[in-house]
Amino acid sequence: MLLGRDMTFSRKILSRGIAIKSTKLKPSKLPGVSFASMRTLLGKLPPLLCALLATGAAAQVSALRATSSNHLNGSKSSYLQRASQQPIDWYPWGEEAFRKAKELDRPILLDLGAEWCPYCAQMDRESYERPEMAKFINDHFVSIKVDFDMQPEIAARLQRAQAYMNLPAGLPLTAFLSPSGKLYFGGGYFPAEPRGGKPSLGEMLEGALCLFREQRKTIESGGFDVWTQEGV
């Protein structure tokens, strides 16, 4: 959830025991958005995913796979190289992805993961390899995938941004950014279907898209700029 308050952040990442040392962070200026209020918000929205979750997903598989040569092809990271076969049009971290988001005026879906992270593999398998989910993401977001081990500086930057927004900062890390790089919502692992009080990735995508459209000025005027590493 997004909360405007000071906080001290220190969190280990899974079994690797990697942690960010406790750091006093400035409060976020964005309004509070909890999972509960997100569900209320989603209840007022048109069912964006209805058409995607309808029958016919199997017919989409071959078409998406045939055009799934994304921007991770040729990456030196074996983790990103495997994701190059996914139907999502992933970009690596860099200016090209942010330039594309500005050109299309779309929010950015950013996924931070690692080869050794079991929940990263599970989220890939459950959600990112599903053709109907990939179609929705490709139609509404510009997507970036980051390898924790290959890009530790970027990983630390993303974790600091999540902490600034009082969001979970483990692995996988799921973040939603404005085209200019302002992080405005996110979390960690999200299941394909709601489970144990945790929203599904589909719900998070709908909510992030709605926030981007309805609170654009607030997002751009506050929060943590992941691209420039500046907290406002």
Region roles according to the model:
Residues 5, 10-11, 15-16, 22, ...:
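Low-acidity, Ser/Thr- and Arg-rich intrinsically disordered low-complexity segments
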Residues 26-27, 46, 60:
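Short Gly/Ser/Thr- and charged-rich N-terminal loops/segments
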Residues 44-57:
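Bacterial N-terminal signal peptides
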Residues 58-232:
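Replace the tail clause
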